[in-house]
Amino acid sequence: MSAPNKEYLMAKATLCRDLAVKQIVAGEGEQAARNLMRMVKALGEVGIIIEREGKDNE
């Protein structure tokens, strides 16, 4: 299995964010926090990919 690409990770981050907002509104704070952490992790991975691409282009 190949590593996820930027587009996949951005879609995952967006999905996790949207779900967390719905969970916050519904009073499901613990689940919302978990989804926000998933979002942060996905965005961090996007940052790593972008950083690697920048180094490859030097």
Regions found by a protein language model. Give the residues of each.
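Short, charge/polar-rich alpha-helical segments
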Residues: 1-7
